[in-house]
């Protein structure tokens, strides 16, 4: 068995409290992901649980991170909690369409399904 790779990251990068700690004062919010990716090699995108990301935003994620960076996306709560995993084909298609700029790269990691209790 070959050794695995351990990655360290956080659930998101858009935290104002990180100004002056991770993000230098004066660094615009549009550059936070790039700075985050200088320190960590993976991130969980929690926002996709609450709303679909735009294709433009996903393209920016890809461009702002180094080649070996990895994204873990949360599946939509609409599919999991509201639809209760029933008739979710169209929703999965919309999700896949939005994340396509990421999915076609090696930066695409797991899609996390936060199931209800």
Map each language-model feature to its residues.
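Residues lining hydrophobic/aromatic ligand-binding pockets adjacent to catalytic sites
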Residues: 1-117
């Amino acid at each position: 068995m070959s050794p695995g790779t351990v990655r360290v990251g956080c659930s998101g990068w858009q935290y104002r409290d990180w100004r002056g700690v991770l993000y230098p004062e004066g660094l615009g919010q549009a550059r936070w992901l790039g700075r985050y990716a200088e320190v960590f090699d993976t991130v969980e995108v929690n926002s996709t649980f609450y709303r679909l990301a735009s294709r433009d935003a996903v393209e920016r994620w890809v461009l702002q991170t180094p080649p070996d960076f990895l994204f873990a996306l949360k599946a939509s709560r609409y599919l999991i909690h509201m639809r209760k995993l029933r008739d979710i084909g169209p929703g999965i298609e919309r999700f896949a369409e939005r994340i396509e700029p990421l999915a076609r790269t090696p930066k695409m990691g797991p899609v996390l399904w936060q199931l209800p209790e």
